């Protein structure tokens, strides 16, 4: 039924902590099932990939704790013949980092997740960067080749940001 209406994949159809339920959905559908956006434990990723719980892995570079573990998940998926269409929840550094690391893997999926939530949902992302690093032209974004992550944080945004210090322990 989903494929009859042009749906090409079903993202995280079950709570992520219910992998066996997700596997049942994956086995029942003719379209790809994606998942893993909230997972950060390599044992969970290994199980997800080994058992083919999903057809497409969606690691999130921030949930994963950085580029290195993200690349490890993408590599595990590649060795298993799975594509990687990462999760990127908002228009911040998570999507900027995701755009860059997608260029570094051979099993990148055909899509880049761009948040549809605007300033009503994520008010803090308004004016975060100078320019428009997420500009879509003919269905594509251009990844900057400027130094670092290729973006510049807006100094006016920084001037109005709240700062807090956190500490572990006592």
Kindly label every feature range from the protein language model:
Residues 147-170:
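Extended hydrophobic packing segments that form well-structured cores
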């Amino acid at each position: 039924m989903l494929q009859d209406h042009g749906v090409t994949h079903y993202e995280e159809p079950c709570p992520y902590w219910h992998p066996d339920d997700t596997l049942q959905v994956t086995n029942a559908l003719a379209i790809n099932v994606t998942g893993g956006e909230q997972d950060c434990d390599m044992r969970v990723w290994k199980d997800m990939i080994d058992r083919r719980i999903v057809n497409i892995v969606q690691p999130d570079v921030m949930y994963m704790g950085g580029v290195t573990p993200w690349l490890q998940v993408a590599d595990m998926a590649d060795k298993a013949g799975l594509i990687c269409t990462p999760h990127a929840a908002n228009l911040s550094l998570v999507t900027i980092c995701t755009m860059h690391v997608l260029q570094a893997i051979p099993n990148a999926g055909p899509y880049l997740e761009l948040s549809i939530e605007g300033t009503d949902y994520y008010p803090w992302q308004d004016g975060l960067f100078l320019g428009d690093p997420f500009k879509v032209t003919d269905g594509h974004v251009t990844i900057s080749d400027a130094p670092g992550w290729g973006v510049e944080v807006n100094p006016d945004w920084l001037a109005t940001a709240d700062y807090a210090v956190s500490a572990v322990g006592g």
